[in-house]
Amino acid sequence: MNETQIQRETRQVVEDVLEKTNLKQGALFVLGLSSSEVLGGQIGKESSQEIGELIVETILGILGSRGIHLAVQGCEHVNRALVVERQVAEQFDLEIVSVHPTLHAGGSGQLAAFKFMQDPVEVEFIKAHAGLDIGDTAIGMHVKHVQVPIRPILREIGHAHVTALASRPKLIGGARAHYPQDAIRKS
């Protein structure tokens, strides 16, 4: 698999999703990543530390330049806990849990987050403003209600299917209420 191509596709998809979601500085962005799927394998079966590092480092660079916080979701073997910076866990009052990811429990994305973040910790749950799912890892449990599907510019990174979610405030009030337009709500 061509690493330059994977990096280019990752950059393209992330920048497109950020443009479509209109995330602000300080927002939380969740990443679900199967490096196995990126390489054309079955999720959890052919994990690649190199691919995890390439993708996470690329995404951290893009989000960091915009002041957006990354949370990297682990697999079911760590109960889908997430790696975030300690400062983010404290700022959002997230419960820190005790686990250190491995390639097959947490996955390559979490290992990469531990490598590239300043002070990484694992947290049990978050409510992200948006997120990217590379390889059908199921990030929905970590994105705020109401979730809005975002169709990225590319449908795959490497061989992995790619989807994205944004969130918008709930519409309440009934027939008499009026709602402001927002960038992601469908008309």
Swiss-Prot record:
InterPro entries, per database record: Antibiotic_NAT-like (IPR028345), DUF436 (IPR006340)
Disulfide bonds: none
Stored HAMAP family: UPF0340
Protein family membership: Belongs to the UPF0340 family.
NCBIfam families on file: TIGR01440 family protein
Taxonomy, superkingdom: Bacteria
Lineage, broadest ranks: Bacteria, Bacillati, Bacillota, Bacilli, Lactobacillales
Protein name: UPF0340 protein SPG_0604
Pfam families referenced in this protein's UniProt entry, alphabetically: DUF436 (PF04260)
